[in-house]
Amino acid sequence: MVSACLAGLHCRYDGRTNHKPEVAELVASGLAVPVCPEELGGLPTPRDPSERRGDSVVSNAGRDVTAEFAAGAEAALYIAEEYGCSAAILKARSPSCGCGRIYDGTFSRTLIEGNGLFADLLLKKGFEVFTEETWPGLSPEERASAPYPGGLSASSSSSDISPHTEPTCGR
């Protein structure tokens, strides 16, 4: 499973994308499914930026959007389980997908230790969670056997996404 914005979908809060070609290739090859928990929770794109404040998620306009974020996390978890996913590559620092470090809820770009709601849920369910900054990527051997530069070969499997077994934020 991957954050849809990393796969090139325009679902970021500002309607843009956080496209990472290597993540998009996982989706294109059928090795990962893209999700945007915030859209799945009913939030529009574009939308106000939001940050976690303790157990809540609030927009920069002061609106409590915790219910939408929680509903989206549950919907994305359902998709992950239906597809048999065991690992995820999620958007760093996001109030949904951040893993290990997120913004502190003051909209000052200050980072604190913590996870987004969706990342938290995946970790509690035993998934391994990476961000685009911590995912180790494909090995040189996998790259060499790929049918196109930087791509995946037909012999690749979903286990290529997760080289570890314990549920942690990849570092």
Report the location of each language-model feature:
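Divalent-metal-activated hydrolytic enzyme cores
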Residues: 40, 50-79, 110-171
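Short, hydrophobic/glycine-enriched beta-strand segments
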Residues: 1-4
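Short, surface-exposed acidic-centric catalytic microdomains
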Residues: 18-59
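Internal, conserved structured core segments that host functional sites
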Residues: 91-107
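Short, active-site-adjacent cap segments at secondary-structure transitions
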Residues: 8, 42-43, 95-98, 137
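Short N-terminal binding/cap micro-motifs at the start of the first secondary-structure element
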Residues: 8-15
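Active-site charged/polar residues at nucleotide-handling catalytic sites that mediate phosphoryl
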Residues: 83
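Short acidic/polar active-site loop segments enriched in Thr and Asp
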Residues: 86
